[in-house]
Amino acid sequence: MSRGSIEIPLRDTDEVIELDFDQLPEGDEVISILKQEHTQLHIWIALALEYYKQGKTEEFVKLLEAARIDGNLDYRDHEKDQMTCLDTLAAYYVQQARKEKNKDNKKDLITQATLLYTMADKIIMYDQNHLLGRACFCLLEGDKMDQADAQFHFVLNQSPNNIPALLGKACISFNKKDYRGALAYYKKALRTNPGCPAEVRLGMGHCFVKLNKLEKARLAFSRALELNSKCVGALVGLAVLELNNKEADSIKNGVQLLSRAYTIDPSNPMVLNHLANHFFFKKDYSKVQHLALHAFHNTEVEAMQAESCYQLARSFHVQEDYDQAFQYYYQATQFASSSFVLPFFGLGQMYIYRGDKENASQCFEKVLKAYPNNYETMKILGSLYAASEDQEKRDIAKGHLKKVTEQYPDDVEAWIELAQILEQTDIQGALSAYGTATRILQEKVQADVPPEILNNVGALHFRLGNLGEAKKYFLASLDRAKAEAEHDEHYYNAISVTTSYNLARLYEAMCEFHEAEKLYKNILREHPNYVDCYLRLGAMARDKGNFYEASDWFKEALQINQDHPDAWSLIGNLHLAKQEWGPGQKKFERILKQPSTQSDTYSMLALGNVWLQTLHQPTRDREKEKRHQDRALAIYKQVLRNDAKNLYAANGIGAVLAHKGYFREARDVFAQVREATADISDVWLNLAHIYVEQKQYISAVQMYENCLRKFYKHQNTEVVLYLARALFKCGKLQECKQTLLKARHVAPSDTVLMFNVALVLQRLATSVLKDEKSNLKEVLNAVKELELAHRYFSYLSKVGDKMRFDLALAATEARQCSDLLSQAQYHVARARKQDEEERELRAKQEQEKELLRQKLLKEQEEKRLREKEEQKKLLEQRAQYVEKTKNILMFTGETEATKEKKRGGGGGRRSKKGGEFDEFVNDDTDDDLPISKKKKRRKGSGSEQEGEDEEGGERKKKKRRRHPKGEEGSDDDETENGPKPKKRRPPKAEKKKAPKPERLPPSMKGKIKSKAIISSSDDSSDEDKLKIADEGHPRNSNSNSDSDEDEQRKKCASSESDSDENQNKSGSEAGSPRRPRRQRSDQDSDSDQPSRKRRPSGSEQSDNESVQSGRSHSGVSENDSRPASPSAESDHESERGSDNEGSGQGSGNESEPEGSNNEASDRGSEHGSDDSD
């Protein structure tokens, strides 16, 4: 069946030439016809496309190339055909360039396509097909992704459903890792044209894989296979999904799919690489190499080439062909993307094999950057950095290994690596890591702990000072090495030698020198070239003071290794210890002349110290001193340039600055060194020296003392001398003497110490002798010390050490001591005289003190006797008072009985209601009688006031008169009857209205007596002699009955010189002070007649009672205002005891008279109320 034909018009005629597509002639023939007939361009393009469809690409290219030049453009819209011609040819070149393997040919094709697209741009730039072709060309170039994206975007703006543009955008989004966006474009293209080729669904499948939607990806790949059973991409995709399931059946299915893909396209690099990976795990390395090499040569995609090279490299690696493996690993890293780090892992292993740890570290760092928590990479990097000398890298290694041990706590190797890193910085951490490793070995692995680990643990304990633990681990390591020697004798014997050496060092530290020496010599018998043993034996001899023996051991080491720097350094130190500066300097210079040790820090420091030491020797050549300073400074600077953290060099620079006189700068240097480390004793001493030079002696003393405590277990005489010097300059001579004496105990034969002790003794003695306040003991002791200093100086001036001090100076000091001793007798005599005077003065003062003490003792004894006598008198007075009280109580009872008989005839309401209180209303004598109290209360109140004199009683009276009446009235009544006292009204209210009387309980009727107590003495009428019990609180006598008022009126008519008996009846002036005469006359005139003729009304009586009560409280008694009678004066002395006793009783029972007053007032008020009723 004919596919069709095309007509070519003949020139200048109406005829045409018809060419059948099934029988197209050769290209050249067609071109000649087209040229001859001057055929239009669109016919050229149609014929060219037909040739392309039939696979005749050469004719296709020839036709389009000829059409560019010879095509007829003389017709409408020829520009579009012209552009189509150029774009079609360019698209062909782009397609060929994509397939081309040769880089030069590929480059030529791209150049031709670029030229053609540029020419087309000049014709119609914004044609959709032209833009699509140009965008695909940009995608091929790879580095013009954004330009292609812009052109696809432009096309989609004009035609949103343009499928090539949608597929182009999907491709760009996928390459930019925007998998969701790419999937969206694929879906849109599929919706626009559901009949899209299988490649569209293949692209969707890849998007689903990247989005981790594996089931949808499987469906997409399967659908692509349904549409195109030869879609290799879909077969590979499904195969990878099957292989990743890691099950036997899935792996089998995956391999079958790959084989099917290989059958369809044997040159597909993706298929070849996956098959190579499969055969690698089957250990068929020849097939791996064949397939991978074939894949490498069949692709220009670098990612594919990297995969192929990696497969080749690891096949050679596993066959131990490390050179070929290195080559392919390296080539794979050149092609690999940043995410494909497996080649770097293999390459790093190859670098480790070659010993290039730096490049190996870089390779593993790239792997770790892509996979930050990869266990194997961190472990390898940790091991690599652990062996580095760079502390920063060691810190990185520590971090990596800690992460490894956290992720896999049972990894013994990681714990051991971590412990080895921590050995330098964290001994306790290293011990802990070793402990964990040993525990895992014993518990999890069920294996014995290797002797290497035991030796390392012992060494760590040794560094910590745990000598016992260290010995235990060293011995265990030796036992373990002997047991393991059966398997590898040479290796474990070497370990035993190292452990034996460590054990010998331990014995040295434990001061078991004999055992250490024995071990060293045993090692040397088996291994005569073990240089360290010679050095340790020499060091032990040096520490014992056997310098010659030490030198012999060091020379033995030099016979084995003539250029051994440690041996030459130790020999040089022997010379320096003997102050042989020249030979010592030559030894260190010899070390620095060797090429391998020309920058040896220790030797350079030693040379600097030699030049610095020469500055301590006395010299007058300032130029020479300056040269030595500059040389030492230059050496220390060189050391700092080589090692910026060398503290000893910094300390040396500070010392040179101090010698130059720059004390402040030197102090700053020393301070910085001490901040960096406090474990260098020289820095402390240098700081103290600077303080002395700056005259900060207190700080210097503290620094020296701290240095002694921190660094020297025993007394170091050199540092003690520095301390004594600071104390001497500070003026603390006594402390200086004690410090030097301690040093003399350590080094009794040291002549410098002896000189300094003598000098301090001399200065102390001089200061004591010049001080006129010094006592005899101090002066005698100073003379004794001066004699001792003289003997010391005399001895030192003859046999002193000329190298350490000037003997002439000792002789001069001896003469000065002799001069002072010649003047000492004057000072002794002066002190003796002063001492005698002080002794006499002290004796006199002691005598006066003794007299004063005896006088005080005598006065105290007299006072005690007086007090005892007074107490005795008081007791006697109390006894008399008690007797008198008993008599008065008896008398009061008889009087009351008489009064009751006289009042028995009265009647009426008054006698009934007021009768229970009438038994208490007596004459004036009864008013003054005391109320019987409970014995317990009377006794207590009386004893409190016994012994008070009359003046005391008088003061109490005056004081108590100021109390308000209401307060006085409530106490006794409530105390007598038991209930709690009630608050009374203020005095103003009592004046207006008499208070309602409180009723006593029936049990108390007839039992209350007057509380006034009258002295039994007949002649005590004077107010100064007579004291009644209720002193200080005057009575209200106006509250008694009419007969009481009558009796009082009669007493007013009697003379003032009545007998003692009448005065006793009228009451005591002290205990119950009377009203003045004017007041008494008023009472008489107001109350005399009514009491006989009529009964007063309640209101009148209440008024009278309140007025009289107020007057009684405010004034002094009648007897207070009149002079005492002569008879009372004559009996004053005889009655003083009785008066005092009564006064004491009254003042002690202050509540009793108050109760009596209230009783009287209550009785008067009750009478008034009865009458008014």
UniProtKB/Swiss-Prot annotation:
Comp. bias intervals (Acidic residues): 917-929
Modified residues (Phosphothreonine): T925
Superkingdom of the organism of origin: Eukaryota
Signal peptide boundaries: none
Primary residence: nucleus
SMART domains reported for this sequence: TPR
MF annotations from Gene Ontology: RNA polymerase II complex binding; SH2 domain binding
Modification sites for Phosphoserine: S932, S941, S943, S970, S1020, S1021, S1039, S1041, S1043, S1081, S1085, S1087, S1097, S1102
Disulfide bridge positions per record: none
Region annotation Disordered: where it falls in the sequence: 892-1173
Keywords associated with the record: Nucleus, Phosphoprotein, Repeat, TPR repeat, Transcription, Transcription regulation, Wnt signaling pathway
Expression (tissue specificity): Widely expressed.
Basic residues composition-biased segments: 900-912, 955-964, 980-994
Biased amino acid composition, Basic and acidic residues: 1023-1034, 1129-1139, 1160-1173
Record's subcellular location: Nucleus speckle
CC terms in the record's Gene Ontology section: Cdc73/Paf1 complex; euchromatin; nuclear speck; nucleoplasm
GO biological-process terms attached to the record: blastocyst growth; blastocyst hatching; cell surface receptor signaling pathway via JAK-STAT; cellular response to lipopolysaccharide; endodermal cell fate commitment; inner cell mass cell differentiation; interleukin-6-mediated signaling pathway; negative regulation of gene expression, epigenetic
Subunit structure: Component of the PAF1 complex, which consists of CDC73, PAF1, LEO1, CTR9, RTF1 and SKIC8. The PAF1 complex interacts with PHF5A. Interacts with KMT2A/MLL1. Interacts with STAT3. Interacts with SETD5. Interacts with ERCC6.
Annotated PANTHER family: RNA POLYMERASE-ASSOCIATED PROTEIN CTR9, RNA POLYMERASE-ASSOCIATED PROTEIN CTR9 HOMOLOG
Protein name, as recorded: RNA polymerase-associated protein CTR9 homolog
Organism field: Homo sapiens
